[in-house]
């Protein structure tokens, strides 16, 4: 397969995800397919965003890493010290992705590291490993292209996350501001009673303890549910199950006291 064909295959995958979050596992599998390598896509803090490995590489240590979806902190630090592409790293180098405890299996292995950059900052690392054969110039071109594309996707996801947080905060603020004094007091007591982000509420018990009517509690919950801040479900005589949908709600409620 030519370099152009390999690049097109990677582009085809990304076009499928246009407008939605990219599954980095799919990206890793595509990179693995077109480069015939083992692949790790790692965040700057060492989280494994995506990977594609052959069975030979799956030692006990690697399996544990995959289960935890995190690489060891010392290896993360070493990766972050790599400022530009480093190619054809052998098994005896501390940057090898292959398990040194199985050195005899990977004596001819080669690791290549591509820093993932975007928006002027380091976002992570693309690590490719081959059991045999050096990485050639075409491999390096494709790897650097893949790292650039991954960087753009990570940035897009970060921006989407920031936008979502801003929307959530606005919705939470509007919901809290829509509550009357007594409704807000009722909500504060409800979540003190729950002691967390979800649980079972018996409205009459809270109403009696706080000295407000049950209808105040019902109205307050309805306003929050309409704003998409919480969800509630009646369990009949057992009470009402309540769950917070927007994770910053309790923090904002505390700030508003």
From Swiss-Prot:
L-isoleucine binds at residues 61, 96, 98. Pfam families: CodY, HTH_CodY. It is found in: Cytoplasm. Signal peptide: none annotated. SUPFAM superfamilies: Winged helix' DNA-binding domain (SSF46785). InterPro entries: CodY (IPR014154), GAF-like_dom_sf (IPR029016), GTP_trans_reg_CodY_C (IPR013198), Transc_reg_CodY_N (IPR010312), WH-like_DNA-bd_sf (IPR036388), WH_DNA-bd_sf (IPR036390). GO terms for molecular function: DNA binding; DNA-binding transcription factor activity; GTP binding. Residues 203-222 bind DNA. GO terms for biological process: negative regulation of DNA-templated transcription. Activity of CodY is modulated by interaction with two types of effectors: the branched-chain amino acids (BCAAs) leucine, isoleucine and valine, which are signals of the nutritional status of the cell, and GTP, which may signal the energetic status of the cell. Keywords: Cytoplasm, DNA-binding, GTP-binding, Nucleotide-binding, Repressor, Transcription, Transcription regulation. GTP binds at residues 22, 24, 43-45, 47, 153, 158. Residues 1-155 are annotated as: GAF domain. GO terms for cellular component: cytoplasm. Belongs to the CodY family. Homodimer. Homotetramer. May form homodimers under conditions in which energy sources are sufficient (active state) and homotetramers under insufficient nutrient conditions (inactive state). HAMAP family: HTH_type_CodY. DNA-binding global transcriptional regulator which is involved in the adaptive response to starvation and acts by directly or indirectly controlling the expression of numerous genes in response to nutrient availability. During rapid exponential growth, CodY is highly active and represses genes whose products allow adaptation to nutrient depletion. Modular protein made up of an N-terminal effector binding GAF-type domain and a C-terminal wHTH DNA binding domain, separated by a helical linker. PANTHER family: GLOBAL TRANSCRIPTIONAL REGULATOR CODY (PTHR40062:SF1), GTP-SENSING TRANSCRIPTIONAL PLEIOTROPIC REPRESSOR CODY (PTHR40062). NCBIfam families: codY_Gpos, PRK04158.1. This is Global transcriptional regulator CodY. It comes from Staphylococcus aureus (strain Mu3 / ATCC 700698). The gene is codY.
